């Protein structure tokens, strides 16, 4: 048994049993992948995969248990390497943060600047994606941590911590009839074409829920994953925008007005997500603490251990 065999099994599951893709990802041949997996099965004395001819179609019952152990073993192996690097050089290394456009564009810049000032030798990578993509990057070990409002708390192998809460706001062009109107209602907003986020992005579910509970039917004419795109089309007069309040900057968005709508939409909570059992370098904890000062390394590390 060797780690390469374990990686082949893990990657076969990740690639939906497509051995061609496994070979491409791990830079080897398909026949080599098949042989290594079969050698491991022979050594263990069980079939890990269900086969139809030469094709893998799923995991056997013992294969499911083996796969869970392999994931654990490979995570522990990576943790060992991280522990060694932690003591070899505590202030340098790599840190991958998976997050959404909204967080990367509006919530993280000051934190990232502070972090790079404190840890100039750490190579930081921001990988943007949908909340579901962020979760997969965490689970696959492609990201050290993820930051998102949606999805992360739906995965049992991801431990999440609340960072901060925020509300949506409505933005309209200057001179719009809604500007200056007091005690704005969702029924009044629904009288105009609406531009807002795609489903599963930036608290869209809270927007839909608010209109449903008010008995109002919004005319959503355009959706996007990016608040900058939403604001651009609002400025063009195509509708009014519903965006995260943090996305409105009166100094930059000079052609727009943000309306007082905090009372209309439920607060959303942005969370940081970490894979259960993962070992984090000290500087990763510092980044989390800079982003959410109420969190601390001892609390986070303790919950990561308890979750295993």
Swiss-Prot record:
Where do the HTH lysR-type domain residues begin and end?
1-59
Against Pfam families, the record matches this protein to:
HTH_1, LysR_substrate
What SUPFAM superfamilies does its record include? Answer: Periplasmic binding protein-like II, Winged helix' DNA-binding domain
The record's Gene Ontology biological-process terms are: cysteine biosynthetic process
Q: What happens when the gene is disrupted?
A: Mutant grows well with sulfate, but is unable to utilize ethanesulfonate as a sulfur source.
Give the UniProt keywords, A-Z.
DNA-binding, Transcription, Transcription regulation
What GO molecular function annotations does the UniProt record carry, in alphabetical order?
DNA-binding transcription factor activity; transcription cis-regulatory region binding
DNA-binding region, residues: 19-38
Q: Which family does it belong to?
A: Belongs to the LysR transcriptional regulatory family.
Q: What does this gene product do? A: Transcriptional regulator that is essential for the utilization of a number of organic sulfur sources of either environmental or human origin. Required for aliphatic sulfonate utilization. Binds to DNA at target promoter regions. Targets include the ssuDBC operon, the tauABC operon, three tauD-type genes and atsA.
What's this protein's name? HTH-type transcriptional regulator SsuR
Q: What is the lineage of its organism?
A: Bacteria, Pseudomonadati, Pseudomonadota, Betaproteobacteria, Burkholderiales
């Amino acid at each position: 048994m060797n780690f390469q065999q374990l990686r082949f099994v893990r990657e076969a599951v990740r690639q939906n049993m497509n051995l061609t893709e496994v070979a491409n990802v791990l830079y080897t041949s398909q026949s080599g992948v098949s042989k290594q997996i079969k050698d491991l099965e022979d050594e263990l004395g069980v079939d890990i995969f269900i086969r139809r001819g030469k094709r893998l179609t799923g995991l056997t019952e013992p294969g499911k248990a083996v796969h869970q152990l392999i994931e654990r073993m490979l995570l522990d192996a990576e943790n060992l390497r991280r522990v060694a690097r932690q003591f070899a050089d505590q202030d340098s290394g790599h840190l991958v943060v998976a997050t959404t456009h909204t967080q990367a564009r509006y919530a993280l810049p000051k934190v990232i600047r502070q972090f790079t000032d404190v840890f100039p030798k750490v190579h930081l990578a921001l990988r943007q994606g949908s909340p579901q993509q962020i979760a997969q990057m965490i689970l696959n070990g492609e990201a050290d941590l993820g930051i998102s409002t949606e999805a992360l708390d739906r995965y049992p192998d991801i431990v999440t911590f609340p960072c901060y809460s925020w509300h949506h706001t409505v933005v309209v062009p200057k001179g719009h009839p809604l500007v200056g109107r007091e005690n704005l209602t969702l029924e009044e907003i629904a009288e105009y074409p609406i531009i807002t986020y795609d489903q599963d992005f930036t608290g869209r579910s809270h927007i839909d829920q608010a209109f449903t509970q008010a008995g109002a039917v919004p005319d959503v004419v355009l959706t996007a994953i990016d608040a900058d795109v939403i604001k651009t089309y609002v400025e063009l007069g195509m509708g009014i925008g519903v965006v995260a309040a943090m996305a409105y900057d009166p100094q930059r968005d000079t052609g727009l007005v943000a309306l007082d709508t905090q009372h209309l939409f439920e607060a959303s909570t942005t969370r940081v997500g970490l894979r259960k059992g993962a070992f984090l370098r000290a500087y990763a904890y510092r980044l989390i603490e800079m982003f959410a000062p109420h969190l601390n390394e001892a609390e986070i590390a303790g919950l990561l251990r308890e979750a295993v």
